[in-house]
């Protein structure tokens, strides 16, 4: 259903507004470069600073432009269950292939609260739901046992795991079964993630180096870890440089060097420091994507 390299798409901005023409061009470029799916309006898509109307318009535009050529997993998370229900229903109505739903952040629900939250979403719309577990941002960590309870629901199909804990992949497979889709949420450890049984990555770096990230994923899924390791070595400096400051800011700067997108981000995020810009430019040259 979902596998391979799936960029967590940036949301282009121009003069403070969403730049839909550039978004359309980015989607076309991503598909032409070999990305296996698209994930709009996650954290990298600046979801916290988009209005509901902008959020839904971005999702609809990506689905429209993709036109069924690759799956679209729409960002639909919130720490307010009622709001998440709205986003999941919109994803379904807009024609998304799935919805990515982050664990509720800031209000710190219990494991039981998370089960109730995702159960409400599964009951609200008949659409495949991918759990997004990122305790570094949400301050809650969904356990494999909780995930197994949710995996029993027919529309809870997988997880984007950004714990950085490679042993978790095996633990989740043991708890949820081999059909439960596991996607990495951390570029730097995606090689090991797939070696443990993962099947893809929802990637920030793929915004900037989509062809290399797609080739990397294809190599790991074919069991060709020699090729994957060579690609990892090309990409690793870029993985690291993009995240010296907030990853979406780094990705937008890198895209600006490629002429694909402006650097514009919304407050409270700021543009990159000069030192980080140098690191990203050097990493792009190392990867062979910038002359």
Swiss-Prot record:
Its main location: cytoplasm. Disulfide bonds: none annotated. Pathway: Amino-acid biosynthesis; L-lysine biosynthesis via DAP pathway; (S)-tetrahydrodipicolinate from L-aspartate: step 3/4. Pyruvate binds at residues 44, 202. The record marks 43, 106 as: Part of a proton relay during catalysis. InterPro entries: Aldolase_TIM (IPR013785), DapA (IPR005263), DapA-like (IPR002220), Schiff_base-form_aldolases_AS (IPR020625), Schiff_base-form_aldolases_CS (IPR020624). One of its GO terms (biological process) is diaminopimelate biosynthetic process. The active site is at 132 (proton donor/acceptor), 160 (schiff-base intermediate with substrate). It holds the Pfam family DHDPS. It is found in: Cytoplasm. NCBIfam families: dapA (TIGR00674). Belongs to the DapA family. Catalyzes the condensation of (S)-aspartate-beta-semialdehyde [(S)-ASA] and pyruvate to 4-hydroxy-tetrahydrodipicolinate (HTPA). This is 4-hydroxy-tetrahydrodipicolinate synthase. The lineage of its organism: Bacteria, Pseudomonadati, Pseudomonadota, Alphaproteobacteria, Rhodobacterales. The gene is dapA.
């Amino acid at each position: 259903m979902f596998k391979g390299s799936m960029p967590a798409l940036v949301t282009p901005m121009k003069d403070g507004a969403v730049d839909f023409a550039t978004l359309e061009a980015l989607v076309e470029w991503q598909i032409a470069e070999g990305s296996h799916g698209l994930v709009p309006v996650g954290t990298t898509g600046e979801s916290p600073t988009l209005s509901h109307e902008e959020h839904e318009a971005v999702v609809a535009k990506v689905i429209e432009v993709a036109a069924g050529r690759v799956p679209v997993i729409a960002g639909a998370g919130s720490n307010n269950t009622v709001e998440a229900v709205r986003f999941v229903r919109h994803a379904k109505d807009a024609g998304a292939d799935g919805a990515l739903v982050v664990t509720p952040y800031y209000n710190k629900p219990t494991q039981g609260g998370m089960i109730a939250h995702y159960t409400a979403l599964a009951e609200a719309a008949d659409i495949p739901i991918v759990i997004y577990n990122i305790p570094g941002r949400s301050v809650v960590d969904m356990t494999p046992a909780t995930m197994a309870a949710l995996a029993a629901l027919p529309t809870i199909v997988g997880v984007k795991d950004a714990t950085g804990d490679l042993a978790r992949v095996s633990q989740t497979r043991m708890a949820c079964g081999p059909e439960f889709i596991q996607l990495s949420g951390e570029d730097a450890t995606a090689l090991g993630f797939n070696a443990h049984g993962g099947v893809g990555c929802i990637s920030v770096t793929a915004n900037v180096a989509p062809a290399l990230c797609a080739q990397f994923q294809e190599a790991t899924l074919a069991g060709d870890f020699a090729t994957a390791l060579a690609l990892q070595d090309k990409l690793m400096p870029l993985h690291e440089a993009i995240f010296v400051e907030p990853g979406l800011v780094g990705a937008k700067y890198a895209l600006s060097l490629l002429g694909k997108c402006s650097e514009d981000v919304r407050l409270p995020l700021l543009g990159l420091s000069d030192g980080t810009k140098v690191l990203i430019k050097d990493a792009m040259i190392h990867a062979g994507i910038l002359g």
